[in-house]
């Protein structure tokens, strides 16, 4: 399983999907302060929310598992001796590792644009939050595997993912980064990890 994870990780490194997603993330975090006029009080109070929204929309653009289904890789995974949900979960984790590495490399720019201080809670919030976003987008991608057209795929992704993330965005993006936000994120994480194998089995049963 460790070898499989490394293979999936290197496959993702040379894929254009993480590059595209991170490019969109950079675009969102740069354009948002420009649109808001660099209002210091607003950016300082809602910086986590704005960063989360930028992460969300950049992650929504990633066609998780769609390319694998089109080229037959999913079928090979299914016929192999490995557990398919674990393979897909490892692929999501590999994508998240690449994404969060890029985000943390750009953290000084985030502090400069959004004018907030260095806080370990911010790092932890973004770390856990991006992992939850990746899992949730992966779940909705599995549910959208039956959609063949790109426009239909994107429409279903946005329609189903955005309402699901509303409670998460409301409770975890305020200026008061209390510990219950972290506990809520951990709860979301374990919920989605437990739901992932079930939803993968349902969506791929055909």
Swiss-Prot record:
Q: Which Pfam families match?
A: CcmB
Q: Which GO terms describe its cellular component?
A: mitochondrial membrane
GO molecular function per UniProt: heme transmembrane transporter activity
Q: Where are its TM segments located?
A: 18-38, 45-65, 87-107, 126-146, 182-202
Subcellular location field: Mitochondrion membrane
Q: How does it sit in the membrane?
A: Multi-pass membrane protein
Stated name of the protein: Putative cytochrome c biogenesis ccmB-like mitochondrial protein
List the taxonomic lineage. Answer: Eukaryota, Viridiplantae, Streptophyta, Embryophyta, Tracheophyta
Q: Which gene specifies this protein's sequence?
A: CCMB
